[in-house]
Amino acid sequence: DWSNPGEVLAFDLTNCNNKQIIIANNLYRNHGFYQTREAIYIGSDNGLFKLTLENDNFSLVKLLSGKIGDVCVCDIDMDGQNELITIKEMHGNCIDVYHINNGTYWKQYSFTENIEFVHAFTKGEINKKNVVFIGVRKGNANTLLLQHDYDGYHMNSLDESVGAANLSFVNINNKNYLGAANHTLS
């Protein structure tokens, strides 16, 4: 019911040890979880955190304040630095893009137009450009495509009234596919 704080745990599975390590506690609605090769990103009502492991030591750094429901990490503007694409609040109605500059993330773009209960993120590459796909469960229940070009960020609708709960992008035999677990027939 999310009324109590949660925690982030790691388990040392070496030699079937199953040793539990508490990484963070007192995180409310720690629902967002995104993994890259370098880090794990955790969204919660306490903010957005980056978890790394170096020399068997966990490090947890707060990147953003405020209620962050979920996150996707992607170099969407193709400048060599990953942006943070977030859902403001858990299952919220605002998508924000943060760009890093001098070690600090700054909001560059917000999208709130007719979206409610934003639920799913996945990233992909189309025509040699990084893009992010977004599933919206209520309101217009669209599947959205976020992209960046010479004049900024753009959000386009790929599908309407389907309410994707999960999305997955894959390239097979040089063809791009977006899989969607929809709660409504299109």
Each model region followed by its residue ranges:
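Beta-propeller-forming repeat regions
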Residues: 1-186
